[in-house]
Amino acid sequence: MTKNDPAAYTPPLGHAALTPIYDAAIALLTRENAWRRALVAEILAGGHDAILDIGSGTGSLAVLLYQASPHAAYVGVDPDQDAVRLARNKAAHSGSAATFVVGYFPAAIPSEPIDVIVSSLVLHQVSLAEKERILAAALDRLKPGGRLILADYGLQDTALARFLFRATVQSLDGRANTQPNADGVLPSLLEKAGFSAIEQRAKWRTMTGVIYMYIAAKPLASAI
């Protein structure tokens, strides 16, 4: 969802023609209700004021966040115009004042420090170099002590999980970008980017493989 080259980003289900059915597919196949609500709970537990969603897709997280905390200040950024159009319509229908920006992180977002950055089902779709770039940019944009919350495919730790991941995610998004996630690369990438307090908070076994939630913080020493 978030690549430097606008012509090269991966649409939500791997193909632009599938974007209209993205919400239904994710709800059916990924236990979305469980992990999205866990993301919302984690965001709100920190009492955050400014929330940025990298690769905000069709806006499902924004709507859930609004329902749980109507005054939360949410901005989503995504390069996919079709997905952003759906997100804006969904937010307007729910009454949410969420802001959605068509563009690439971090260039499309004002440079003010952010309390919490969240990203879900994005990093597995981009190259290893792009995963590193996104995480480095997230660290740079966070306030010292600010948190990054990720929900994405991680280590596929059983034969069944690997089979499901290959049959679904990799059949749509390809192997080159997704395999590092399946090999469990995310914690080491977070450490390499400079995050501290890295924690695997939860994981969900789904029909598409194992999805993890990771929490990490920008060190307070970054204020110096």
Listing of model-derived features with the role each one plays in the protein:
Residues 52, 58-106:
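Class I SAM-dependent methyltransferase SAM/SAH-binding core
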Residues 132-144:
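A short glycine-rich, Lys/Arg-flanked "PGG" loop and its adjoining helix->strand segment in the class I
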